[in-house]
A protein has these predicted regions:
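C-terminal boundary of histidine-terminating zinc-finger modules
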Residues: 272-282
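P-loop/Walker-type NTP enzyme "switch/lid" segment
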Residues: 90-172, 271
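Short hydrophobic alpha-helical segments enriched in small aliphatic residues
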Residues: 3, 22-27, 39
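Cationic, low-complexity basic patches in intrinsically disordered or flexible, solvent-exposed regions
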Residues: 2, 6, 15-17
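Conserved catalytic-core segment of NTP-binding enzymes
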Residues: 162-262, 268
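Walker A/P-loop phosphate-binding motif and the immediately C-terminal alpha-helix
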Residues: 51-90
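Phosphate-binding P-loop
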Residues: 46-50
C-alpha cells in the first residue's frame, strides 16, 4: 500500500522493520543510521513544509463536520497531493464523519509501551520506542485520496512524559511526509499542543451563532496565542439560524471567514448514518467551508 503512494516513507518503514529484528545492543547504532537515512532519502521531499490545518471550537457546534468537509474539499481539489486527517478528539468522531474504520489508535501504541515497562519486560527503552515508531504506520488507515490517524483517548493517570514527547515528535515527522494535514481537535487547544504538535500553519475556530460560542472561541484564541505557533487564523460561524443577526457575532482580532446556515441536507445525511463524503456537492456546509478555505488561502 505504501510502496506506491508513499515510496520514501515505505523505505523508512522497511528499515525500521529490520531494526526490530536485531539484537538490542545494535538498536542504538541502527536507529542513528535510520535517522541519517531518513534525512538522506528525504531531501527536498522532507524539506517541504506541510500545510497543517487545526480545527478547534466549543463542543456541539459542528467542528468535526467542518474538519471532515475540509478533508473532502482538499481531496477533490488536490487529487495528486498527500493528505492526512488526524482525529485528536477522544470521541473519534472524525472517523465516523469520514467513513473510516479505526482498528488502532496512537494511545493504544502508547499504552503498549507503558504496559511493557510496568510489566518489567527486558526490552530497552530505545527498542520499545523504535517499535512504537514502526507501529504508527500500522495505525495509519489508507482511504481513497487521504490517510487517517486516530490519537485516541486521553492518557491515563501517571506521567510518561518521555513516551508522549517521543510520539508527538513522530507525528511531526509523519506530518511532514504529507502536503496537507487536517487535525480535528477537542473543544480546547491544550490537548493538541500537548499530544499532537506545537506549530500549525492554519488555525480554524468554529462557533455557532450564540454569544457563548463566540466567547469560547475568543478564549481558545487567547490560549492558542500562548501555547502554539500558527501562521493564519480565522473563525467559521456554523449552524446560523438567524442570518439577519449575523453582524452581532464578533471575535476580537480574528476574521470571520464564513457564515454557514443550518443545513437540512447534512442533518438528513447524519440521520442516515452517511459520511460527509456522501454529501451533495452543493450542500450548505461544503459551500461555506469552501468559502472559508479560499479566504484563508488553502484552496
Amino acid at each position: 500500500k505504501y510502496a506506491t503512494k508513499y515510496p520514501k516513507v515505505w523505505k523508512i518503514k522497511k528499515l525500521q522493520l529490520f531494526i526490530l529484528h536485531v539484537h538490542a545492543p545494535c538498536v542504538r547504532i541502527l536507529t542513528k543510521m535510520c535517522y541519517c537515512y531518513y534525512a538522506q532519502i528525504g531531501g527536498k521531499y522532507m524539506d517541504k513544509k506541510a500545510k497543517i490545518i487545526t480545527v478547534a471550537g466549543k463542543g456541539g457546534v459542528g467542528k468535526t463536520s467542518i474538519s471532515a468537509s475540509i478533508v473532502r474539499l482538499l481531496v477533490e481539489r488536490y487529487p495528486d497531493k498527500k493528505i492526512l486527517a488526524i482525529d485528536a478528539d477522544p470521541a473519534v468522531g472524525l472517523s465516523v464523519a469520514l467513513g473510516v474504520d479505526v482498528k488502532l489508535t496512537l494511545d493504544d501504541i502508547r499504552m503498549g509501551i507503558v504496559d511493557s515497562v510496568e510489566n518489567g519486560e527486558t526490552k530497552e527503552a530505545l527498542e520499545l520506542l523504535s517499535e512504537a515508531r514502526f507501529r504508527i504506520f500500522d495505525a495509519l488507515v489508507e482511504m481513497p485520496g487521504f490517510a487517517f490517524l486516530a490519537i485516541g483517548r486521553p492518557e491515563s493517570s501517571g506521567c510518561y512524559c518521555k513516551v508522549n514527547s517521543y510520539l508527538k515528535e513522530v507525528i511531526g515527522l509523519l506530518a511532514n511526509s504529507f502536503d496537507y494535514v487536517v487535525i480535528d481537535g477537542e473543544a480546547g487547544i491544550e490537548q493538541i499542543q500537548r499530544r499532537v504538535m506545537e506549530k500549525v500553519t492554519h488555525l480554524l475556530l468554529v462557533t455557532d451563532q450564540s454569544k457563548k460560542g463566540a466567547q469560547v472561541v475568543s478564549t481558545i484564541k487567547n490560549v492558542a496565542d500562548e501555547l502554539i505557533a500558527y501562521d493564519r487564523i480565522g473563525v467559521i460561524v456554523n449552524r446560523v439560524t438567524y442570518p439577519e443577526l449575523a453582524d452581532l457575532i464578533t471575535v476580537p482580532g480574528v476574521e470571520i471567514l464564513s457564515f454557514i446556515p443550518a443545513d437540512s441536507a447534512f442533518a438528513a445525511n447524519d440521520i442516515k448514518g452517511k459520511s460527509v463524503l456522501e454529501l451533495p456537492a452543493d450542500s450548505a456546509v461544503l459551500t461555506g467551508v469552501k468559502d472559508a478555505l479560499q479566504k484563508i488561502e488553502i484552496l
